Amino acid sequence: MSTNSPSQKGKLKAVVISSAQELNVDVDLRRLHEACSSLGDYIAPFMKRVRLELQRVKDGEQADVPMVPLFIHSPIPYGEIKILFLDVLSGYPFLRVIQLHRCSIGDDGILTIAEFIRSYKPSPDRNPFGIQCFEVPECLIGHAGAKHIAKLLSENETITRCVLDFNPLGDAGAQAIANAVRWNGTLEDLSLQYCGIGSSGAEALAEGVLRCSNVRVFSLRGNPIGPEGIKPIGMALSIGGRINAIDVAGTSFGGSYQAVETFCQGVESSVSLTAVDMDYNLLVPEAASLIASVISRNKRLVQFCVNERMEAQQFLMIQNALEQNGKGSKKRKKKKRSKA
């Protein structure tokens, strides 16, 4: 019988069980990979990511839950959209990001995906976040599909980023989205680039997004909203207090001094805005001095992109004003750190 005390014996190494091991992540990844094997070639890149993640879990390199986004960048046959979302993915508990780029899913396809997101409720110990990022650029979604997305957003409490770029939503689709986001408390980043939105759609978005929602980053780049569309956006900026960055590049309003003035007045009055992009708008000559003075008066502005096709002296005037704001911003940060 050994007389050695426990302290004299070699200490046993503590066994550390990772989150991945505790939750049997490898089982879920293997099931997902097997289920995807019955689908078309479009799913191959995603399957490769899943297989690599599974190997990392087996090798002990992945100790946490998997973060594999559903990223597909080619057309999905309509017949397989329901299989993918309602059969294959419904049982996978770790999905947080859906990125479908140029997938040609159309209005009927987006209805199926909206139903999936609405019903996707994984257990909190595995995925307390749910679907947080939803990107469907260039997917042939029209105003009917926009209404399906709008209904989802009006009910959803998990999505923080929504990208609908290069879809023909039109004014009707924009109005549906605008009415929905005012009831959504979690969406922070909304992108509607090149969606064929005109002045009436812009007016609805000014009210729903800029005045009544929690959206902090908003893009209307490439939409023909024109002078009449930018005016309500400018007025909404002066009232809303959430927006941090707005992109209205290439929206065809720069030729109207009155429109530029109204927009700039809103930018100047904003208590939250730090970044503005109005590039690809040919500006009237008087606009440069107006923009520079707005930047000088609103010290929060540290980014302000404009079309470089103007007099060099005018462009430098704007850049100098931004540089001064940038220096001031750094000083304010240093003061906060010293107080802390």
Feature-to-residue mapping (PLM):
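Leucine-rich tandem repeat or coiled-coil scaffolds
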Residues: 1-340
